[in-house]
Amino acid sequence: MTVREKAELIVKDIKKEQETNPVVIFKHIAKKEYVSIHGPEHHILDGASLLVAYKNAGGEIDLEQALDRLMAEGLRMPGAMCGLWGICGAITSIGAALAIIDGTGPLSMDGTWGNHMQFTSKAIGELGTINGPRCCKRDAMIAFKNGIDYVNAHYGVILQYEQMQCEFTDFNEQCIKERCPFYE
């Protein structure tokens, strides 16, 4: 199955979610057979989970249009960018979702451009402290924690968050176990 096919299934299935906690939405979809333990489909799944939770919490967006745009942006992000480019796709996916919510672009001067950069640098700093190897599930949880804090501080909606233990350890051959803040 191609990344595009996985992305289309993610977008189709995620529209059915009713939660205001993006981590719960993420876990529902991440357990589906078409989502790999690691892979570039997370570049769509992570931001899409945030967008759906935002909409469900009362955020004003055209969800159909937002998910289409997020899928297009996520498909431009290559796999392994964390190791090859030094930036995590989970974090860039959440950053893309924030840009969609705010209508931010490269020439934006309303403060959102800088705010998104601050979100990204804070989240990537946490990942850097934990260190590798990559884990798309752990990295998503760090991105969500920071993304939820950002949404709750900036948008007048409240997304739910609670730190949950990882349910994917047994499927990850490179799990860092005790070094991971989500390890059971």
Residue spans for each PLM region:
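Short, hydrophobic/aliphatic alpha-helical segments
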Residues: P22-E33, E64-C82
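Polybasic, low-complexity association/targeting segments
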Residues: D13-G47
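Short glycine/serine- and small hydrophobic-enriched flexible loop segments
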Residues: A48-A57, G95-G103, K145-D149
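C-terminal auxiliary extensions adjacent to catalytic cores
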Residues: V151-E162, T169-K177
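Cys/His-rich short segments
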Residues: M1-V3, T169-F171, K177-E184
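A structural-propensity feature for long, helix-poor, extended segments
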Residues: I101-D102, P106-N152
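Conserved phosphate/anionic-ligand binding catalytic regions in large, soluble enzymes, centered on
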Residues: H42, A80-A96
